[in-house]
UniProtKB/Swiss-Prot annotation:
The lineage of its organism: Eukaryota, Metazoa, Ecdysozoa, Nematoda, Chromadorea. This is Probable calcium-binding mitochondrial carrier CBG00135. It comes from Caenorhabditis briggsae. The keyword rRNA-binding does not apply. It comes from the Eukaryota. Its main location: mitochondrion. Residues 70-105, 107-136, 137-172, 173-208 form the EF-hand domain.
Amino acid sequence: MSVTVETPLQAGPLLKEKKQELIDIKNIQEHARTVQPFKASKHQPLISGSVSKEAAIATHAALHIDLTPEKEKKIREMYDRLDADNDGSIDIRDLTQALSSQTPHIPATMAPKLLAKMKREDSDRVTYADFTNYVIAHEARLAEVFDQIDSNRDGEVDVSEIKSYCKEMGVNLDDHKALSIVKKMDQSGSSSVNLNEFQDFMLLYPSTDMREMVDFWRHNLIIDIGEDGQVPEDFTPQELQSGVWWRHLVAGGVAGAMSRTCTAPFDRIKVYLQVNSTKTNKLGVVSCVHLLHAEGGLKSFWRGNGINVIKIAPESAMKFMSYDQIKRWIQEYKGGAELTTYERLFAGSSAGAISQTAIYPMEVMKTRLALRRTGQLDRGMIHFAHKMYDKEGIRCFYKGYLPNLLGIIPYAGIDLTVYETLKSCYTQYYTEHTEPGVLALLACGTCSSTCGQLASYPLALVRTRLQARAISPKNSSQPDTMIGQFKHILQNEGFTGLYRGITPNFMKVIPAVSISYVVYEKVRKQLGATMS
């Protein structure tokens, strides 16, 4: 193999041939390791002025002879945007920051994999030459993928072609989901995607494996933040057969256990305020902390956390199995058609109701244990449950069941509806032909979740009071029905009485979500569950 070079080289971003000389390819590789580019932040050409023959050879090898001025300018500008600290190279911090702020459709957790694709093996940084090589090679592979998706060879990929391609990969999408993917890639508003749009959108996704790309579209471009807590994850038949599903359930279980344990003090304070705070005693968060610490010390803030963690496994398994079966029934009723967003919401809410019914006795025990005093658990949880049964019978394990069940649907429905409405309004007024960024989606998700909690919290409070009624002297004379509790609270404490304890409930949201996300990602990777 040989290349054509010049001696000397004129200033400029491209190489103009004056004198031809054939150089063996092994010499090119030798020289390419020694040539350092200028800083891209200055928008200077890689080679400027008269340089040696070796530098010209290395430059040709790195930039490819057929690179046009327009293409080089585009690559330079892209490189400059990624080089956040303007030090002339790209490292892991630059990529993480860029993925977070510039490409919200690609998770920042992909930065290490992307860096490995771009850099040389003997370096932990990406030079301009490395980046150019990556862009050209990656775009070439993306062009091959685009050709496979573009079944009618018209140079455009539309909704039907996305659906067909995903189906070949074992993923069935309805029109709504396929349109969501196309809209995120489409820059012109044409409801289809050309090659340049496809390459621009997928350029920083560090893989061209067809199966991985379809997984990326399905899990990152469709599932909305507002649904995450309400509708269980969907798994394809291939993922069910390969065992991916259980790895994600295990990762989710470990993440949930860590999150609940770290935020258990917030949960105990909330439960205590729900049951004991009134208009007359004016018990607040700070005074509650002092009271609980004085009664049982620091360890007392984790009362009830053990059973709260234990119930994760049966609840998750029951919800997953129920959700999968309900989806199948709905699909059979519809003749095999894909589920809509609200059909998934119905299936998820129904699965949640079934799983809650199965593990509800553990919910009651969690509340009782969170409210217990020092010394009331001297012989373990089983003995504690046996004492409850002896004193109150089997019905005590389902106290507050009705408000708990009724609280599932309004929370899920309001959360999803508000989220979709806010996202639609944002897209209509603040963006053109593109989806909102990460910060906008997080804001929509936070608002929708808050609305869902505000709507369902009175039911949660009544549920907790009914669960705790037998062991709380203050509540011994209170009604033992849901409607009776609502009347009692409104008559004696007013409307604000329905929101006792909501402050610590909101306080735990950010740390709970953050811890859960970090632990989930770590465990998922350790188990080898690759989901982009």
